Amino acid sequence: KGVYHYIGSMYHIELEGRERRKMIFLLTALGLIAAGAFVLGGFSKGRTAQTFYALLPFVCGLLPTGYFLMGLAEWALHKGDFTRKGMDNAWTRMVHSAWGLTVCAGMAAIGSIIACIVHQTIAGEVSFLLGVLLQLGAGIGQIVLLRKVKVTEIRRGDEQPAEK
């Protein structure tokens, strides 16, 4: 299955074969290009650098947060009468996005350390710190919430009689 299967499961892509690989490559490339643009912008001197670094944690958090909300909506819709597989797919999407949000916040924190070294100042001080803290809190909160709800659901599932 390999790397493409893992990345595909993160993106929740239903395509198969060559189309799946092309879509995964495209999404990953776009993400790397966007991240690269922000890092390069951050290394430029003056006001541009401060703007880039002030916005970086918020931009990093947009994709995983949107992804989490999509998974949350899908999971809520599956709560009624959908299959176990559908519930698990939605759950997986939310867990991946929660971890993604936490990782992005960590990357933004590393970016702020680089900004301190390069510019001898914290760029966008309050804005940047707020963005990083919000992402770390949201990511960790999502992971804790998801684990707690999952355990409750499994316990409820064990109480039901098995189908023959």
Regions found by a protein language model. Give the residues of each.
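Canonical alpha-helical transmembrane segments of integral membrane proteins
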Residues: 25-44, 60-63, 100-112
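Helix-coil boundary and interhelical linker segments in multi-pass alpha-helical membrane proteins
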Residues: 41-52, 117-124
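Alpha-helical transmembrane segments
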Residues: 49-66, 130-133
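Cytosolic juxtamembrane N-terminal segments of multi-pass membrane proteins
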Residues: 1-21, 82-87
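Short membrane-interface loop/juxtamembrane segments of multi-pass integral membrane proteins
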Residues: 81-98
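Cytosolic juxtamembrane helix at the C-terminal end of the final transmembrane segment
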Residues: 139-163
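Membrane-water interface of transmembrane alpha-helices
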Residues: 62-82, 143-150
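Alpha-helical transmembrane segments and their membrane-interface junctions
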Residues: 103-131
